[in-house]
Swiss-Prot record:
Complex and partners: Composed of 13 different subunits. Subunits NuoCD, E, F, and G constitute the peripheral sector of the complex.
EC number: 7.1.1.-
Listed GO biological process terms: ATP synthesis coupled electron transport; respiratory electron transport chain
Gene Ontology MF terms: 2 iron, 2 sulfur cluster binding; 4 iron, 4 sulfur cluster binding; metal ion binding; molybdopterin cofactor binding; NADH dehydrogenase (ubiquinone) activity; quinone binding
Residues annotated to bind [2Fe-2S] cluster: C34, C45, C48, C67
Residues reported in the UniProt entry to bind [4Fe-4S] cluster 2: C151, C154, C157, C201
Residues that, per the record, bind [4Fe-4S] cluster 1: H99, C103, C106, C112
4Fe-4S Mo/W bis-MGD-type domain residues: 221-277
This protein's name: NADH-quinone oxidoreductase subunit G
Keyword Metal-binding in annotation: yes
Amino acid sequence: MATIHVDGKEYDVNGADNLLQACLSLGLDIPYFCWHPALGSVGACRQCAVKQYQNADDTRGRLVMSCMTPATDGTFISIDDSEAKAFRESVVEWLMTNHPHDCPVCEEGGNCHLQDMTVMTGHSFRRYRFTKRTHQNQDLGPFISHEMNRCIACYRCVRYYKDYADGTDLGVYGAHDNVYFGRTESGTLESEFSGNLVEVCPTGVFTDKTHSERYNRKWDMQFAPSICQQCSVGCNTSPGERYGELRRIENRYNGSVNHYFMCDRGRFGYGYVNLKDRPRQPQQLRGSDWIHLNADQVMQGAADILRQAKKTIGIGSPRASLESNFALRELVGAENFYTGIAAGEQQRLQLMLKVLREGGIYTPALREIESYDAVLILGEDLTQTGARIALSVRQAVKGKAREMAAAQKVADWQIAAIMNIGQHAKHPLFITNVDNTRMDDIAAWNYRAPVDDQARLGFAIAHALDESAPAVADLDRSLKGKVDIIVQALAGAKKPLIITGSSAGSDAIIEAAANVAKALKNRGSDVGITFVASAANSIGLSMIGGGSLDQALELLTRGEADSAIVMENDLYRHAAKDKVDAALDNVANLIVVDHQRTAIMDKANLILSAASFAESDGTLVNQEGRAQRFFQVYDPTYYDDPKKPESRSIMLESWRWLHSLHSTYTSRHVDWTQLDHVIAACVEALPQLQGIVEAAPDATFRIRGQRLARSPHRYSGRTAMRADISVHEPRQPQDIDTPFSFSMEGNNSPLADRQQIPFAWAPGWNSPQAWNKFQAEVGGSLRFGDPGVRLIEAGEGTLDYFDSIPAAFTATAGNWQIAPYYHLFGSEEMSQRSDVIQQRMPTPYVMVNPADAAALGVNLGTLVEFNCAGQTLRLPVRLSDTLAPGQVGLPLGLPGIPPILVGARVEDLREAVQ
């Protein structure tokens, strides 16, 4: 700690910080532009000037840039000094000479750091009356709009995009006061993290193009604390709504998880919530017609189905909340509950849980990954399957430069000096995958091989680290030298990290990763292990347990159950089409609960219109084992026209539908009237989920008697927004499930004792930089702790080494193994329904080694077809020199190419008949 003196007052601060960060952490306001907590200091904008004095007796002092000045013990500064204030105002005036006065039409208005800083410095009158420099804007793709004329040349965008996210296609061009930030030519930004430019940019140069189409000011939207539903990482988000539509998603700060950044799929992939073809009312099939029902009618109809059924099973979903899966389990009974996950995938998830619980290996939070100094990734194309983890790994690799700088006593925030000292030095990163990955640019070595061979390499590394681990007898000689290099790097690291997951479709690769981690732990290393799962709640559903989807389908095919309830699950993604069809042909009554129209609904008798994440509350468990609550953003019924009952929205949380059905079926009163009741019942029945109670406060939580506001206090137009429906303003929706209010009424103070924050706003801070006001220390944890609770902690380490080493892959003529390829834009079930994501999705393809292509007599672009898992695929050929012969790569998860094809065999690959 250090003691500094600011305007005559004494403060204790972190001596490792610079003065800007220290003062902001104290709650003192110093304007700034180029500095960012995650990007460090470069002193480019000169906006954060303060007066520094030599000692208490010095009355003259000198101007210094607070972001470039260490907070050393005994520092005396003044923020309010008249010279410093005048200098800061003049800096804004310089910046404004070329900045257009277009706030009323700028999409950043009301969410703009430049506006905040201009007001903070007191600059309110423009003296510049001459020509402004102007630029041509670029088309940067479907996600981001570009308006270069608003640029103040703070350099944040390129520092984030190039230096932090390792993007290569955004740069700065020009000189002196005429610089241009963009691409060499128009084109889609290639980085999977480009959307963060929207929040990193302090002005309106980069804005959310998906928001532009249905634009609202920040103060006119309703927000809620939420969790990204698009992968297993569990990034915290702030979705914003107006007029019953999601308008945008912003990053929500969580110091333990995603902190300031998220991936583009999570930010822009929300369009499926706004689709017009969503089921918005319950429907029942009568003859060949679908009849719309009200809630009471559909509950009676569903209860009659259950009463007449010989046996009913429930099929859950890894994209549904814990509460919804538990409600289905309670309805059908634990013995009749099936997870909706394919048997192989479920086995891999249970294996990962076993390692997490019994392996004795620590699983780091997402933010902690950045502190590791050697990383081995086995079988995951991490940028496509867990993108935000990939961004953290990039920071871990860059940690080498920080380590070198620290040895020379350079402060951690002196980023320009750190980069100069580091000269692109990196901590070692080793990657195995079936083909190239998006992280190859920072890897020390890449091993491209079939999945079984990747697992064998992992087992060999474990044995080289610890001879008591099982050996790989016939390892390829060419790999032994590489194994030695990897072993040397991992063993020499202070904190090695092993990353793997379920997407490779292999138990062996998970076991190999566990063996490597155990071998390192036996050597005394502070080792970590991170698993990547396939869906937002895969880990949570695995903790609930239940039969696999394969078992459920077998039961239905044999006729042992004649009715099924399928909740938020398109079975065709998790099982072969012919097996699903055969099973459902034997089902007398199929009840489907979902918020999206899926192929399974074509075979349903009854459809219950569920609420999406934006219209519901629930709990998810991420790949780390962290339980996190997401909250309802808006009530869709508020916008219903009472004169048009046929268009009324009847969308309830899946758990509400299922519990209501349970109560109707058993002729008893509804027990679960609010979310807290479900959670209490869940933890009583499933003690392993006990911690979810602490994931968020209950519905009775208040701050000084107030609920928490979902909307900023400047929210406007409430009395007019339904005027086209009725001039009579209805009562605002009442939230019985959470401590939030569906309005601006309530507490939104940055100083309030809460972790769940719907939106970032503080007096004088309207932009995302307002998160500074919610943090215990700027860039650290939130003031009252980061939300979420870990359900799994490393045990004593009772797990033995795994010894099921697979045989080496052998290519066989006329027989190919499907190798998994994943795409951030397209492989995930929900986001692929969004229009803007579809613009970034690749055309489906089959990847073939050139030698195999020559043997087949096909070329690049040739259409080939083959049968697999009960369906015929017809796809154009792509060629890859680095895909091992004997394999065909498929973009798993894209429409029509289910993920369960991973590892399957293809025997009849042939050129398609034109």
